[in-house]
Amino acid sequence: MDYEFLRDVTGGVKVRMSMGHEVVGHWFNEEVKDNLSLLDEVEQAARTVKGSERSWQRAGHEYTIWMDGEEVMIRANQLDFSGGEMEEGMSYYDEESLSLCGMEDFLRVVAAYREFVSKA
C-alpha cells in the first residue's frame, strides 16, 4: 500500500494512496483533515480489537471506518443506498468507494500522517 502526503496552497495536508486504496486517502482528506483526535480514537480502537473477535466502527460524514483484529475497511457512506434509491442507469464504482487493508499497514499510514502533519 503506497501513499504520498502533500500540502496544498493553504497548507492543508492531502493524502494520495495507491490504486485499490484510494478510499483510505479520501477518508484522511474528508474525515481526518486536521482532527488528530479522530486518529487517537481509531488507534485506541485498534488496540482494543487487536487479537480479539471484536470489531469497531465509526461512521463519519462521508466515510465509515470499520476494523476487526486483522483488517480495516473504509467505505463511502453512499454505498448504503439501495439500488432503488439510485437513478436508473447509475451505479457506484466500488473500487473508489471501498478499500480493505491490513491493520498493521493502516496503522503505519496513520503514524506517517501524524509525523507529516507535525512537520508543519
UniProtKB/Swiss-Prot annotation:
Domain of life the protein comes from: Bacteria
Pfam families assigned: UPF0231 (PF06062)
Membrane-spanning ranges: none
Annotated InterPro entries: UPF0231 (IPR008249)
Classification via HAMAP family: UPF0231
The family this protein is said to belong to: Belongs to the UPF0231 family.
Name recorded for this polypeptide: UPF0231 protein YacL
Record organism: Salmonella schwarzengrund (strain CVM19633)
Gene from which this protein is expressed: yacL
